[in-house]
Amino acid sequence: MNAKPDLFIPEDVFLRKGARRATEIPEHIRNWLQAGHIESVNLTEWLAIDHVSLFQKVTHEWGMDAETIEIMEQFKQLNGQRIMKIIPAIGMQWLNLLNRLPVNERMNLFRSIAEHRSDSVRCWAAYIIGLNSGLNLTEKLEHIRPFGADHHFGVREIAWMAVRESISAELSLALQQLIPWSVDPDPLIRRFAIESIRPRGVWAKHIQELKENPAMALPLLDAVKSDAHKYVQDSVSNWLNDASKTNPEWVRQVCATWTQQSNTQHTRRIVTRATRSLT
């Protein structure tokens, strides 16, 4: 249920930088993206994907036309919706379909979605996990972890978005369970631990408890106050910048403490970016 063995894609396609505007995406690149044959390489390409069309092509390739006729009819209601509404909607339809299958078939089909060559398809798999009411928070975090460490930027973003509502609903438990993630050897996992609990976040609902009491997350933040990876540093500084909108003095105090405890170039960069909104 993946790449066709006779499909040839030139190497330069995989090395492309990507168009700056959707209108500048070459037709052959757009066609390969829409067929699920290649990954997007930047946000412009990622946002240009027609997920409903991609769903139809993928399921047709997998011989699932009969099983998805009704789903395609329901997708007509998604016309004009933003991508951050469409991806969860497709994830939910996959979840409903998977739940009707025997266990072995369900596992094999989910694996095909989760390991698909298209980053957009893997995004659906993340929401299949996040929307699954049969999984508790611990199980969702366990299953979402590979997506949080995916090599593709889009899948990593969708990964934390897919479980953010579950994290917010059981915040204290989530903060405890994410502590080991904040010291994980993989910077992508450390970044997930911070990004998933940002008080305001991007394209996500605010977590009111953390806006009002950001100190709840201090054990995780302290663990990455001098992280060597800019990807993690940016997440930490953005987290504190979020908090500065409602608790500016707390952010100033944390940054002052960190500067005293860890006067490294990494901490200094985090502190500088964290206080960018403070006067």
Identify what each model region corresponds to.
Residues 1-279:
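Surface-facing alpha-helical segments and adjacent helix-coil boundary elements at the starts of domains
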